[in-house]
Amino acid sequence: MRRKNIIGQNIRKDRKNAGMTQMELAAQLQLLGVKIDRSTIAKIELGLRPLSDIEVIAIARALKTPVLSLLGESETLFNQWIERNE
């Protein structure tokens, strides 16, 4: 199964819904003590850079969205993968 980066896609969606640029999100993360710059956010949104749990929580806080909103359908995709590989 080809991996899909649901979190990156959802960060982009939630960031745009919040009316924030990548630069503004990076600035909010800096205020929270998380050093992620604009180019790193671009890589995250494109699925080119994985996230730590702390980074996911910080991004959710900066976007004022629940962590589960960022995870989206990740659990559903995982369960489908498990079923296919049993």
Task: Label each PLM-derived region with a short phrase.
Residues I11, Q22, R38, D53-V56:
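Helix-turn-helix DNA-binding elements, focusing on the entry/boundary residues of the two helices
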Residues Q9-Q30:
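Short basic helix-loop element that most often maps to the first helix and adjoining turn
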Residues L31-P50:
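Recognition helix of helix-turn-helix/homeodomain-like DNA-binding domains
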Residues I11, L25-A26, I41-I44, L70:
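Conserved hydrophobic/aromatic packing and binding residues within compact polymer-binding modules
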Residues K16, Q30-L31, L46, I57, ...:
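Residue-level detection of the helix-turn-helix DNA-binding "recognition helix"
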Residues L48, S52-S69:
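DNA major-groove recognition helix of helix-turn-helix/homeodomain DNA-binding modules
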